[in-house]
Amino acid sequence: MAKPDKVDAVTEIAERFNTSTAAVVTEYRGLSMAKLVQLRRALGEGTTYRVAKNTLVKRAAEQSGVEGLDELFVGPTAIAFIEGEPVDAAKALKEFAKDNKALVIKGGYMDGRPISVSEVESIADLDSREVTLGKLAGAMKAKMNQAAALFAAPATKAARLAAALQEKREGGESDAS
């Protein structure tokens, strides 16, 4: 790779580190090109999966202020740069690694700090943002309905009591006639 190409590659990787919400470092030793294409499709539009030379990635990480990942850049390295919610991409990587033993998740970077393999897997086990928001909305609606029923209960009881008293009075008046 010529020097200008290396400079461009470092700049591009540094830019990806800066714009991504998370990055997952993987080893892809033994994956065919067809499998890499399949993985890229599984990751979706919000994630860029890039194979890169370790020295260039180290320089790019240093340039963008990313620290603590140097030990991950050993062997054939590819990085999934995730823009947006990291849950779906982490799920896709975990599933793909389960089906293809040649893909090894080494760790990653999120919220300004390195994350371990177990943290990446924990993120993959989370519900997506949409599912979590749906659960929250459902719980809030149930609590609102419960609160409305509690507030309406005294008024309903008072109305029933008034109706019972009125029936009793009307019943008492007809007996007196």
Curated annotation (Swiss-Prot):
InterPro entries, alphabetized: Ribosomal_uL10, Ribosomal_uL10-like_sf, Ribosomal_uL10_bac, Ribosomal_uL10_bac_type
Pfam family, one: Ribosomal_L10
Signal peptide stretch: none
Classification of source organism: Bacteria, Bacillati, Actinomycetota, Actinomycetes, Pseudonocardiales
Function: Forms part of the ribosomal stalk, playing a central role in the interaction of the ribosome with GTP-bound translation factors.
Protein encoded by which gene: rplJ
UniProtKB keywords: Ribonucleoprotein, Ribosomal protein, RNA-binding, rRNA-binding
Family affiliation: Belongs to the universal ribosomal protein uL10 family.
GO biological process: translation
A GO CC term attached to the entry: ribonucleoprotein complex
NCBIfam families in alphabetical order: PRK00099.1-1
Keyword field contains Secreted: no
Disulfide bonds: none
Origin species: Saccharopolyspora erythraea (strain ATCC 11635 / DSM 40517 / JCM 4748 / NBRC 13426 / NCIMB 8594 / NRRL 2338)
Record keyword Ribosomal protein present: yes
Entry protein name: Large ribosomal subunit protein uL10
Subunit (UniProt): Part of the ribosomal stalk of the 50S ribosomal subunit. The N-terminus interacts with L11 and the large rRNA to form the base of the stalk. The C-terminus forms an elongated spine to which L12 dimers bind in a sequential fashion forming a multimeric L10(L12)X complex.
A GO molecular function held by the record: large ribosomal subunit rRNA binding
